[in-house]
A protein has these predicted regions:
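A glycine- and small-residue-enriched flexible loop/hinge segment at structural boundaries
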Residues: 40-91, 141-155
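ACP-dependent fatty acid/polyketide chain-elongation machinery
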Residues: 1-67
Length: 205
């Protein structure tokens, strides 16, 4: 069986070096560092007090406040980069067979901050099991791919690879193979993580 040719039609980036592909690439070539002192929480008592954070990003630039409340930050990052990639690709989804278009995303830990915040809220409460109804839907790793598919109407394969720091690489490889083998015509792929929080930094310390 002859493998199909695969091309990259659009790119998106939201990184500690820049919030668009062009900014990220320019800063990368300039040798700039994305590391700085942690600003997302008070890390003064932590062994590690620096991290590579995404800077100057406002989720409300890409979705409304009601949507933002339903998503963990790692899913918001996924939606932001996908939006840029679609705009870069200039693909007209009306010309795509959406049954053969899917999402293969990568994330090592998913909604860690959601899990952390819900545990803190329970600990600080009166012991009553009052949890946000979006707790699990925000936290689970595969929800990022789900939100992308829902927004763009993609009805093909939809899943997230979880393999620690190789998660996004594995997602891209899977997406490549799905197209090469003729299973899909079009795949959104990549990865997102939002681990700069108390649980993330404390755990990796």
């Amino acid at each position: 069986m002859e493998k199909k040719r695969v091309v990259v039609t659009g790119l998106g980036a939201l990184t500690p070096l820049g919030n668009t592909v062009d900014t990220y690439w320019d800063n990368l070539l300039a040798g700039k560092s994305g590391a700085d002192y942690i600003s997302k929480f008070d890390a003064s008592l932590f062994k590690t007090q620096f991290a590579c954070e995404v800077k100057g990003f406002d989720p409300l630039d890409i979705m409304d406040r009601k949507e933002v409340r339903k998503l963990d930050l790692f899913s918001v990052y996924a939606m932001a980069t996908t939006k840029e990639a679609f705009e870069d690709s200039k693909i007209n989804l009306e010309t795509v067979n959406l049954d053969r278009a899917g999402v293969v995303w990568g994330s090592g830990i998913g909604g860690m901050k959601t899990f952390q915040d819900e545990c803190f809220n329970y600990k600080d409460g009166d012991g009553s099991p009052r949890f946000n109804p979006f707790f699990v839907p925000k936290m689970i790793v595969d929800i990022a791919a789900g939100h992308i598919s829902i927004k763009y109407g993609l009805k093909g394969p939809n899943y997230v690879t979880v393999s620690a720091c190789a998660s996004s690489t594995n997602a891209i490889i899977d997406a490549l193979m799905l197209i090469q083998l003729g299973k899909c015509d079009f795949i959104v792929t990549g990865g997102s993580e939002a681990g700069v929080n108390i649980a993330g930094i404390g755990g990796f310390n």
